[in-house]
Design a protein with these regions (language model features):
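Short, intrinsically disordered, charge-balanced linker/junction segments flanking boundaries
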Residues: 58, 168-175, 185-209, 280, ...
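Short, well-ordered beta-strand micro-motif
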Residues: 152-154, 173, 278
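Non-catalytic DNA-recognition/assembly elements of restriction-modification systems
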Residues: 205-264
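Sequence-specific dsDNA recognition surfaces
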Residues: 252-267, 282-309
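Hydrophobic, well-ordered secondary-structure elements that form the walls
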Residues: 89, 151, 234
Length: 309
């Protein structure tokens, strides 16, 4: 295991690995972005044997929305840390490895922001995107409330013929990870969607019906390319006409609209009986709210205290 960490957390990591009896000598305290690893380069050992630099597998939960001064060291120079972090992880994969793959936790903004279009194009060109896992907002609380996704890709840094490329990738939307989506992160009695994702590992990926049964969606790359390489899977869902016996009413007739301040994070979560919605609950690519699936509830007592009811 190799790893870089810019803060003193690197020392804690090394200590934990020592206590666990695992190797720890390859954990270093340094700025990863200032020290890119070129997985396409080679070196010769003392016996004259040529080896490739880089790694077979890269796992990363990168810092979100940071700025960097080391963008010039990468193929797409930028001060945007999200772009450079993804490029750094890709660059570190051994190009000679037939099994070179990576799993990256990225802020959801990486999947749709206009200023990162070129980076997404670079990603799709230099690897085979296999799946994107959408995580619920709040999964990393209390450290950050940023909405995140997992990118899983194979054949990183390899030259892939067009005829060998997949025509689509899998998208899975996690609604619940088995814990409350608040600062307390209490374990829920209800099943976790992650248990469904575990089925992914058991299936032959060519058995499409089985994948669809556990909740995966197929996202065609041709649609992605026509939409600025936006990778938010929900954007490409087929719109189904819904016939309802209920009259259409304005939202003000069925809900209390409150604006002007943020709702305290400490009060957000699954505890309570009254659902509430925030601007952040909107689908980032479509301005639609899933009214049947609120991420947050509030108790009657708090709603009365806030004079909402």
């Amino acid at each position: 295991v190799y790893g870089h960490e810019i803060t003193n957390t690197a020392r804690i990591t090394k200590m934990n690995m020592i206590l666990a009896g695992d190797g720890h000598s390859n954990i270093e305290m340094k700025d990863s972005l200032a020290n890119p690893i070129d997985g396409t380069s080679t070196y010769t050992d003392e016996n004259g044997v040529v080896h490739h630099n880089g790694f077979d597998i890269v796992l990363a939960n990168m810092p979100y929305s940071q700025k960097t001064k080391y963008g010039k060291l990468y193929d797409l120079p930028s001060t945007n840390g999200d772009s450079i972090c993804v490029q750094h992880c890709m660059k570190a994969i051994n190009s000679a490895s037939a099994n070179g793959r990576m799993a990256l936790v990225v802020p959801e903004g990486f999947l749709f922001r206009k200023d990162l279009t070129k980076t997404r194009e670079y990603l799709l060109k230099n690897c085979q995107l296999q799946s994107i896992i959408s995580l619920p907002q709040g999964v990393f609380l209390p450290y950050t409330g940023v909405k995140t996704d997992i990118i899983y890709a194979t054949k990183v840094n390899q030259k892939i013929k067009d005829s060998e490329r997949n025509k689509s990738f899998w998208y899975f939307d996690v609604k619940s990870d088995g814990y409350t989506l608040d600062n307390h992160r209490r374990k829920l009695d209800t099943p976790s969607d992650l248990s469904k994702y575990e089925e992914y590992r058991k299936f032959d990926k060519d058995q499409v019906e089985n994948m669809l049964k556990v909740g995966f969606e197929i996202i065609p790359f041709d649609k992605v390319h026509r939409n600025s390489n936006i990778l938010v899977g929900s954007r490409y869902r087929e719109q189904k006409a819904i016939i309802s016996n209920y009259d259409i009413v304005t939202i003000g007739d069925v809900a209390t609209l409150v604006s002007g301040y943020g709702f305290p994070v400490a009060l957000q979560g699954q505890a309570g009986t009254i659902p509430f919605y925030k601007v952040g609950d909107m689908n980032l690519s479509g301005n639609e709210i899933e009214m049947h699936d609120s991420r947050n509830y509030v108790s009657i007592e708090i709603a009365q205290e806030r004079k909402w009811i």
